[in-house]
Amino acid sequence: MIFNHHQSVMLNESIGALNIKTDGIYIDATFGRGGHAQGILNKLGEQGKLIAFDQDINAIEYAHKNFTDSRLTLIYSAFSNMLNIITQQGLMSKIDGILMDLGVSSPQLDNAQRGFSFKADGPLDMRMNQTTGMSATQWLNLANEEEIANVIYQFGDEKRSRHIATRIKKYQQKHTLETTLALAGIVSKVVKRQKNKHPATRTFQAIRIFINQELKQLEDVLEQSKDILRKDGRLSIISFHSIEDRIVKHFIQKNSRQKNLPKGLPIIDYKIEKTCLKNLGKYFASKAEISRNKRARSAILRVASKN
């Protein structure tokens, strides 16, 4: 098996959080270039199984070329379809753990043709699955100024969102906005450069999240996980920005918080509504990892188990 240059963030911590059983069945919801998947396979015995999802055909093609392990099943699909696929495979409530790495992989960022990067010029696409949906260029040309501003503010926490949207529409009066560097240039005229952060970071993040409906897909798969996991099954989720982390945090808290106790004494056990999850905490990358891989500095790992 051949790895490319992509470094999986918090590899040992996220896999350790799964508490892997050698004969267990696990899901890697975001295969990418297979770093976490290989880590899971390394801990599984001959009877163990790993099901890996990815909606990027490049990731699936890479997996077919570089992974020959018979314990691995590849699914070309967004992870929001997990419940349907696991049901079809007869594995409902039989999964021992689900791992999600919510970051964009280095090959996606580094390939200018994908449209994720503001560092190299390419078509303004940003779709994880380039065979479906609307590209960033198409959306920016169809959306009005208010819609663009709202997306950049809501999904990017960008305070200058309205000024950016105004500049985008002004640019489009004379030009077609269709390249990454054109968009980055527009944003850079509005947002001041911060230390270690490109002015267009939040805008690109926001448009990517919106185009791919990433937060809706995350909310969907989190709810599905409650039915997919077996008792004591683990959730191990790495997020890279505050919006995703808030969704994961609130999901775990909501489902691990003890409900109000019934009135009256004595309190009978069967009348106490059981919590669905147990919150097993949050973790950050080590200083050593951050020094090797700057992407790790914003990573937050949250872990939970099913009651």
UniProtKB/Swiss-Prot annotation:
Main location group: cytoplasm
Cystine connections: none
Catalytic activity: cytidine(1402) in 16S rRNA + S-adenosyl-L-methionine = N(4)-methylcytidine(1402) in 16S rRNA + S-adenosyl-L-homocysteine + H(+)
Domain of life: Bacteria
Binding residues for S-adenosyl-L-methionine: 34-36, 54, 79, 101, 108
Pfam families xref list: Methyltransf_5
Locations listed in the record: Cytoplasm
GO MF term set: rRNA (cytosine-N4-)-methyltransferase activity
Gene Ontology CC terms: cytoplasm
Keywords attached to this entry: Cytoplasm, Methyltransferase, rRNA processing, S-adenosyl-L-methionine, Transferase
Enzyme Commission number(s): 2.1.1.199
Protein family per UniProt: Belongs to the methyltransferase superfamily. RsmH family.
Protein name: Ribosomal RNA small subunit methyltransferase H
Species of the source: Ruthia magnifica subsp. Calyptogena magnifica
Lineage: Bacteria, Pseudomonadati, Pseudomonadota, Gammaproteobacteria, Candidatus Pseudothioglobaceae
